[in-house]
From Swiss-Prot:
Chain positions of all zinc fingers (C2H2-type): 280-305
Main location class: cytoplasm
Keyword ATP-binding part of the UniProt annotation: no
Annotated source species: Homo sapiens
Motif annotated as Nuclear export signal, chain positions: 165-174
CC per GO annotation: cytoplasm; cytosol; nuclear speck; nucleoplasm; nucleus
Polar residues composition-biased segments: 45-55, 348-359
Protein name: Zinc finger protein 395
Biased composition (Low complexity): 17-29, 209-229, 376-391
Summary of the tissues where the protein is detected: Widely expressed.
Gene Ontology MF annotations: cis-regulatory region sequence-specific DNA binding; DNA binding; DNA-binding transcription activator activity, RNA polymerase II-specific; DNA-binding transcription factor activity; RNA polymerase II cis-regulatory region sequence-specific DNA binding; zinc ion binding
Amino acid sequence: MASVLSRRLGKRSLLGARVLGPSASEGPSAAPPSEPLLEGAAPQPFTTSDDTPCQEQPKEVLKAPSTSGLQQVAFQPGQKVYVWYGGQECTGLVEQHSWMEGQVTVWLLEQKLQVCCRVEEVWLAELQGPCPQAPPLEPGAQALAYRPVSRNIDVPKRKSDAVEMDEMMAAMVLTSLSCSPVVQSPPGTEANFSASRAACDPWKESGDISDSGSSTTSGHWSGSSGVSTPSPPHPQASPKYLGDAFGSPQTDHGFETDPDPFLLDEPAPRKRKNSVKVMYKCLWPNCGKVLRSIVGIKRHVKALHLGDTVDSDQFKREEDFYYTEVQLKEESAAAAAAAAAGTPVPGTPTSEPAPTPSMTGLPLSALPPPLHKAQSSGPEHPGPESSLPSGALSKSAPGSFWHIQADHAYQALPSFQIPVSPHIYTSVSWAAAPSAACSLSPVRSRSLSFSEPQQPAPAMKSHLIVTSPPRAQSGARKARGEAKKCRKVYGIEHRDQWCTACRWKKACQRFLD
């Protein structure tokens, strides 16, 4: 323990330090050798030598920090010793040991020169330990020469397999990322959907918004802001992953490998609780083909409808605007697949309800109940081709006008107005779903018009519950100039009868409202 402390703390530690050792700075008046030594250190017998001045020099057992417990003796001329010189251990012969000054003159054999060292920096060859340590650093010119050797520092060597383990871990991370369903996309197709955004902000189901931010012939809005919004990146929008946005969330978050998306007979995805399957329907007039895969519907639009024009730069990604998503139940999905293949399936309904995503503009309690299907205007088409859901607009849609349409039939009911303030009116129109069997939330479009109302809103037959009362329609407060005040009651000529507040042109305190 003592050697460890002396090696770590060096000259700051009192353990092993010389107490009464002579030095050159102390001058000729140094302590005699008969002074008491450290506690626990016993004086050694005097050394016998023919040299008279060296006979009275005893050996002292003083532990110096540089020798790690080795005995420090009175050196005799001709003894083989080791010294630290130039940052390395050198072999030399003792020429003279000045006990009063505490210095030893040593002749270095390899360097062929004579040096004068302190006693702490010299040790005998026969007393050398297996690993002699460097002397402690002293401030001054010699401090640069005596530097600790790196072999005395316990530094663990870096193993060669550590780098390989890092590379292995990096490879495993990259492999896991490449196998993740968030990154997967089939070759030869472009990114069209974002499954992470689809859960909270679904894109239009009739097709993606192109990079120019404009619409196509599908009858939806066109952005007039001029700001282009590129389509979001997607893990290819196969029904396996797009169903997560509209179906119940899965509990399995492990890595899955998607089967070949080019095969139209790919295995059905994991059955969800609501039994809803996402299909893709062609929007080309008089077509209405329904397929399972987004790749198949794109290939169908390119091959049958667009032709060779889709390869040009002008019509690039034009097929994205000619298909939409349709959510069907499991039994109706089989019927749609059979209808696409040309084989009729008995016992299946001919039309399927179109689920419409509910918007969060107003709570459902604040909206009137949807009207019957018979009141809707516009033609309807039988078959699963006619049921098209209305999709939510993308983030590039104009914020001042929200409009959602259900298919090309433009099925809209008579709109009504909700007075919110004298200057802002909210128009809400309902569009019923194509099928009466569907009991989902109806589609509504809300437009805000900032204009003066021509007449108050007519009374509604249906009960309308408005959650927030109109702010600007409080009848308790009288209009400006109608309230009684002293100026109107007494007149200007009888100013002496006014109250003090009216005299100072403040609110009248005598005739309160």
